[in-house]
Structure formats: C-alpha cells, structure tokens
C-alpha cells in the first residue's frame, strides 16, 4: 500500500507541475515502482492504462541497456522509442534508480504525453517514424545528478514548444525523484 500511495502522490505532483495541458486536464500519465528485475511493484491509480504497460516494458529495456551495476544515484534515463515501450514519439518515459545507503533498491518510472515533439504532428500522414517527430533512443538524461544540457537543448530545439517541452521533461524527472525519496522513506 505504501508503494501505491507513493506512486499516486508522485502523479499528483507531476500533474501539478505539468506544462502539457493533456497531462493537467486529461491525466495522460503513469508512474510506478519497480524491483531490480524490472517487475512493477506498484502503480499509480491515476493515469492511462496504456502508459502503464508500455512503461513497464521500458523499465526492462532500460535495465538491459544500462545494467544495474552501471547505475548511480542521480542517474535518469529517457526514451520515446516505440519499440522500447512507448506508444508513440510523443510519449516520454523517464526511469530513475532509487538508492538507500549507497545501494540500488528499486527503480521509479513515469510516462507522460508531451504536446509537441516536432515532425508532422499526430496523424496518419507520416510514412515513417522520423516524420512523426524527434526519436530519442534509450539515453542517459542525467549522470550522477548532472543533467545532460546538450540533450535537453536538442529535444527543445526540435519542437514547436521548447520551453514547455523542457519543463515537462524536468517535471517527469522530479516525479521520479520524489518517488525515490518516498520509497526510501517507506523503507526506513
């Protein structure tokens, strides 16, 4: 129950800090706590069921791309790769390892729809993935607590709403940070 409450509280923080109206007004988001094998331990009640399933797949792929023994406190991983667990390029997944006493104890992940990610926009006119918008493979958004400003600038400059897009990425990162803190508090 504590993990569920923690996930739900993070969702509320994400909705409160969201730049995208689709998050604030429609709840197009999900969040969850995962064990070290990428299995979901709890998910927020608020949110989109489709995001929950895709987010769960993304966490497993993040663990495969970035083995647990290479993760550090303050790391944040990001993708919008539909083949690695997002519905489409507008859905961003951020995953953060949670640490207690310098040991990784779980992962917190959240998914959210961003209003614009470049490209033609949402619709049937795209004939390949690149026409849909900026395609972000599994990357490290933060390394030991230091945000990758180059990646953030790249993301922002490839959208029609750079400020809102960057704000939503930071909001997702904060959601995970709060989730990890609440997980550790629960463990204490």
Label each region the model flagged.
Residues 104-158:
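Gly/Pro-rich active-site capping loops and adjacent beta-alpha segments
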Residues 12-18:
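Phosphate-interacting basic helix/loop segments used at nucleotide- and nucleic-acid interfaces
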Residues 25-28, 90-92:
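Short, small/polar residue-rich loop motifs at catalytic or cofactor-binding pockets
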Residues 1-6, 10-11:
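Single conserved hydrophobic/aromatic residue that forms the stacking wall/gate
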């Amino acid at each position: 129950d504590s993990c569920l409450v923690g996930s739900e509280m993070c969702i509320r923080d994400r909705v409160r800090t969201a730049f995208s109206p689709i998050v604030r007004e429609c709840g197009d988001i999900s969040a969850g706590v995962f064990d070290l094998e990428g299995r979901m331990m709890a998910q927020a009640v608020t949110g989109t069921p489709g995001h929950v399933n895709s987010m769960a797949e993304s966490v497993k792929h993040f663990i495969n791309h970035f083995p647990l023994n290479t993760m550090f406190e303050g790391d944040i991983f990001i993708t919008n790769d539909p083949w690695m667990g997002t519905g489409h390029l507008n859905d961003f997944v951020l995953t953060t390892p949670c640490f207690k006493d310098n040991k990784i104890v779980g992962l917190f992940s959240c998914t959210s729809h961003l209003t614009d990610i470049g490209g033609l926009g949402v619709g049937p006119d795209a004939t390949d993935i690149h026409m849909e918008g900026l395609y972000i493979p599994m990357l490290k958004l933060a390394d030991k607590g230091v945000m990758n400003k180059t990646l953030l600038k790249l993301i922002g400059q490839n959208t029609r709403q750079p400020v809102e897009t960057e704000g939503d990425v930071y909001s997702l990162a904060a959601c995970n940070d709060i989730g990890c803190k609440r997980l550790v508090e629960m463990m204490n």
